[in-house]
A protein has these predicted regions:
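Short, intrinsically disordered terminal tails adjacent to the first/last structured region
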Residues: 150-159
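C-terminal module of multi-pass small-molecule transporters
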Residues: 1-148
């Protein structure tokens, strides 16, 4: 690989955080094209840069006999983490919406109340991504050279 997984994944955390922060600027008058779509594209690119190297890193050094089990554990952890994360951010959005409704004495279906809840959830999401990026850089020590050495060890010469 040209770049190590630490840098690629950190770049993904940066992009995803930036996209999430763009979503915190939403208002009830926001439209899809200039406000939402660019942020969603940036978040998607960032997540792609996070999950591909993360998978390679998680399976790095796992013996051939254990690759299937390690991959299954990784996929299970990603599914559970995604479900818990969505539930957590949904709870944040719902709680923030309820707090806004009570504080401002507005209808719960008022667009400003809904957007307030979403903005709080996007802010928390950005914070979680920042924390993930910091933990990634602090804890993952696999370099590009390590990954290349693993690729060379896995190759077989054919005559």
């Amino acid at each position: 690989p040209r770049f190590g997984p630490r840098y690629v994944t950190f770049g993904g955390f940066f992009l995803a955080t930036f996209g999430m922060l763009l979503l915190t600027r939403l208002t009830p008058d926001s439209t899809y094209w200039p406000e939402v779509l660019p942020a969603m594209i940036i978040i998607s690119l960032g997540m792609g840069l996070i999950f591909v190297p993360l998978s390679a890193t998680a399976l790095f050094g796992v013996g051939d006999d254990d690759t299937g089990v390690a991959s299954a554990v990784l996929n299970t952890a990603q599914q559970i983490g995604g479900s818990v994360g969505i539930a957590f951010l949904n709870t944040i959005a719902t709680s923030a919406t309820a707090a806004y409704v009570i504080a401002n004495n507005v209808n719960p279906f008022d667009a400003s109340a809904q957007v307030e809840g979403y903005v709080d959830a996007f802010t928390w999401g950005a914070g979680i991504l920042v924390l993930g990026g910091i933990l990634w850089v602090a804890l993952v020590k696999i370099s590009r050279k390590d990954m290349s050495a693993g690729d060379k060890a896995a190759t077989v010469e054919v005559q």
